[in-house]
Amino acid sequence: MKFAVIVFPGSNCDLDMYHAVKDALGEEVEYVFHTETSLEGYDGVLLPGGFSYGDYLRCGAIAQFSPIMEEVKRFAAEGKTVLGVCNGFQILVEAGLLPGVLHRNTGLKFMCRTVELKVENNETRFTSDYAAQETITIPIAHGEGNYYCDDATYAMLQTNRQIAFTYTDNPNGSRGDIAGITNKAGNVLGMMPHPERAVELLTGGTDGLKLFTSLVKQGAHHVKTTV
């Protein structure tokens, strides 16, 4: 597979995402600047963490209007793989590709530490290499990771099995302990924790690696069956 890492002004986890794909997975990856208007030739899109446009107005609120985002929407509508991590998750929500909103953490402080997650659905293209209900350890680094949605949306997420990851010990107040969700089609995932920072033992663990290996296996299968 060939991946595009979207770079917005203020992105700071693009290097980590690039490293996870190129060095940990050995897959092809390129940076794509936010002013571009084509994703032709790519099989997957990765929206990294950071502080796009300085997080002015709201996290991701300005980035959603970047030229590349219209192409990301088209890409997602075609059933292709889109992953947004931390600020990338916030951008996906602001762009309407995922439901809900991300508020300030309940403690009103930026948090940077490792947390435990539970794999709620291992039947997505992002989680198939994990065991059902597997507990994994992944870093977080955010000040606005408190996921919220209304009752109807939360019921929909549960019914459609769109909740991919939950926190075992909720650090930010997210509704239902939600750490990551997919769209209804299952080809778009947004999550606040950083799997790209957990792909090597040297840097603290490899629990994030299975997300990327799942993505490659399932994504490659999807590409083959839809060409």
Swiss-Prot record:
Domain of life: Bacteria
Subcellular location: Cytoplasm
EC number: 6.3.5.3, 3.5.1.2
Annotated GO CC locations: cytoplasm
Keyword Lyase: no
UniProt entry tagged with the keyword Transferase: no
Pathway info: Purine metabolism; IMP biosynthesis via de novo pathway; 5-amino-1-(5-phospho-D-ribosyl)imidazole from N(2)-formyl-N(1)-(5-phospho-D-ribosyl)glycinamide: step 1/2
Key words of the record: ATP-binding, Cytoplasm, Glutamine amidotransferase, Hydrolase, Ligase, Nucleotide-binding, Purine biosynthesis
SUPFAM superfamilies on file: Class I glutamine amidotransferase-like
Xref: InterPro entries: Class_I_gatase-like, PRibForGlyAmidine_synth_PurQ
GO MF, one example: ATP binding
Reactions it catalyzes: N(2)-formyl-N(1)-(5-phospho-beta-D-ribosyl)glycinamide + L-glutamine + ATP + H2O = 2-formamido-N(1)-(5-O-phospho-beta-D-ribosyl)acetamidine + L-glutamate + ADP + phosphate + H(+); L-glutamine + H2O = L-glutamate + NH4(+)
Gene Ontology BP, a term: 'de novo' IMP biosynthetic process
Job of this protein: Part of the phosphoribosylformylglycinamidine synthase complex involved in the purines biosynthetic pathway. Catalyzes the ATP-dependent conversion of formylglycinamide ribonucleotide (FGAR) and glutamine to yield formylglycinamidine ribonucleotide (FGAM) and glutamate. The FGAM synthase complex is composed of three subunits. PurQ produces an ammonia molecule by converting glutamine to glutamate. PurL transfers the ammonia molecule to FGAR to form FGAM in an ATP-dependent manner.
Record-given protein name: Phosphoribosylformylglycinamidine synthase subunit PurQ
Organism: Exiguobacterium sibiricum (strain DSM 17290 / CCUG 55495 / CIP 109462 / JCM 13490 / 255-15)
Name of the encoding gene: purQ
